[in-house]
Amino acid sequence: MKKVIGLFLSAFLAVVPGAPVLAQRSNLAPIPTYEVHRAKIAPRIDGKLDDAAWKTATPVTFAFPWPDQTGKKQKTTARLLWDNDNLYVAYECEDSDVTAIYTKHDDPTYKDDAVEIFIAPPGVKNLYLGLEMNARGVLYDYLYPFPQRIMKNYNLPGVRLATSIKGTLNNSKDQDQGWSLEVAIPWSSFSDLADNPVPKVGDRWIANMNRWDGTEPNRRLSQWSDSGLVKPDPHYPDRFGKLVFVE
């Protein structure tokens, strides 16, 4: 499969223009590292995060790199686990007004209240999988040969996700508490990027996690690892964080 996708990408990249130079900010924080613990029992994917498994996962809180954005600074916490079948990611999002309009697979969920993970196995340069998931539980998945064009038609079979909302969706007249999301990403999703995608203890992958919150013009992007870009943009793999797989 890697050979097939390599041939496809060669043809794909040959017909798209080069990317513009991306302006970066200075004095950036060090790239973070996260130890992904092995789950003894796989969490239920129901969006509620009440499984005992999540208690063994270290929480990380997203930062707000762009002070000029006018949206509320609402807290996002993420946790990761793994086993021989899947990578598990959980997000908890404080949100006073949960909004999600898009309902179909591969809709532009990033325009809603949404969370994301971008991820690639070791040895892969500027090529990663993207999963962007809104508060409804709608998935936009793709392969991104950065900095070219996102391959929107590339799908990840077997991904399971669910959300839970504390409040009412798309009702700005009341006060919500927030929403949470769980996703299980099969290691088989990475079979085009790695011959043996199931990690071993000590393996290091690259990833970033993000949240889009609010509606235009009051919208804000928060991140685990600051992309360092001048304008709010999560896509910059040189600034992805490191995932280390541990017991």
What are the functions of these language-model segments?
Residues 1-4:
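Positively charged n-region of N-terminal signal peptides that target proteins for export
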Residues 6-16:
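Bacterial N-terminal signal peptides
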Residues 15-23:
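Sec-dependent N-terminal signal peptides of Gram-negative exported proteins
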Residues 22-247:
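Structural preference for beta-rich elements and adjacent junctions enriched in aromatics
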